[in-house]
């Protein structure tokens, strides 16, 4: 029987199958192979007479996140508030970079639309849309935009990510219709949210699954080669092969088609500046965790 791990606590794993939910333990062979079952894993299980099960096989993972420890994510809803806390554009770009690297479809949800006059005219919206990403506007407290999020979840294994205080837990509670996740208050001193989510669990919503991100995701460029970075910017792709020099990093090289596109306004200046920031970090040998 096949299913998906929705929760793991103290060596027990809860597997959602077509026949229902089963509590399972993992075979010892996984320990020998240094393979630990993760939430999101697609697995094969055997059920005993007491309706308990054993995980016999873990299928190959499409991707794997460390924080939260979740595998096979197909879509990320990146939640940022327009204000309280204010948007950190570098951080938003870093989330997008990680999504591209892990082959995760990214949708950007801007929450707290009531705090700005005209959400669609905010510069950050223009920057994100120019890169080809879908944008959803939310007032999660009032329930505005929640149905659009619900629609996006269908058929996907989804993760909500973004900075603390942006409204991730509020969104989950609205989607599920009950307080599954504790919501944190914004600290007046820091204007940042006190992070409150403490565990990873898949919640079934519509025809998909949703996991909230416990803690801040670990964002690192350590595993990304400098030559790979250009491919993580969707707006660069159609220009990359037109450059005069093979291996062009679109940095200081002449006859660069990406830089020409930038000059013509086809690539947003702030996205290109972020790209150069990452390239320079790699050239200096820095692999900072952000």
Swiss-Prot record:
Entry binding sites for Zn(2+): 243, 248, 250, 256
Q: Which residues form the CP-type G domain?
A: 62-219
Q: Which residues bind GTP?
A: 111-114, 162-170
Write one Pfam family the protein is assigned to: RsgA_GTPase
Top EC class of this enzyme: hydrolase
Which Enzyme Commission number(s) are on file for it?
A: 3.6.1.-
Q: Which GO terms describe its biological process?
A: ribosomal small subunit biogenesis
Q: What name is this protein filed under?
A: Small ribosomal subunit biogenesis GTPase RsgA
- Supply the source organism for this entry: Clostridium tetani (strain Massachusetts / E88)
**Gene symbol of the encoding locus:** rsgA
């Amino acid at each position: 029987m096949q299913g998906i791990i929705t929760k793991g606590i103290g060596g027990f794993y809860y597997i959602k199958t077509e026949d229902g939910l089963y509590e399972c333990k993992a075979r010892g062979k996984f320990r020998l192979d240094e393979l630990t079952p993760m939430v999101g894993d697609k697995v094969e299980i055997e059920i005993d007479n007491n309706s308990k099960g054993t995980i016999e096989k873990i299928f190959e993972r499409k991707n794997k996140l460390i924080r939260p420890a979740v595998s096979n994510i197909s879509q990320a809803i990146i939640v940022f508030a327009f204000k309280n806390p204010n948007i950190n554009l570098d951080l938003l770009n870093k989330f997008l970079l990680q999504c591209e690297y892990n082959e995760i479809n990214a949708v950007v949800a801007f929450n707290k639309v009531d705090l700005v006059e005209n959400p669609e005219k905010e510069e950050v919206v223009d920057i994100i849309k120019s890169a080809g990403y879908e944008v959803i506007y939310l007032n999660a407290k009032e329930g505005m935009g929640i149905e659009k999020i619900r629609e996006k979840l269908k058929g996907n294994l989804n993760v909500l990510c973004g900075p603390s205080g942006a409204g991730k837990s509020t969104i989950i509670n609205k989607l599920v219709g009950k307080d599954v996740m504790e919501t944190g208050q914004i600290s007046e001193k820091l204007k940042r949210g006190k992070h409150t989510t403490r565990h990873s669990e898949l919640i079934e919503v519509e025809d998909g699954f949703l996991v909230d991100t416990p803690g801040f995701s670990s964002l690192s460029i350590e595993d990304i080669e400098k030559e790979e970075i250009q491919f993580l910017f969707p707006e660069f792709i159609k220009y990359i092969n037109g450059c005069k020099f093979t291996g062009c990093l679109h940095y200081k090289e002449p006859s660069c088609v990406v830089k020409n596109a930038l000059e013509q306004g086809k690539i947003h200046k702030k996205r290109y500046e972020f790209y150069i920031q990452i390239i320079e970090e790699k050239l200096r040998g820095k692999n900072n965790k952000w």
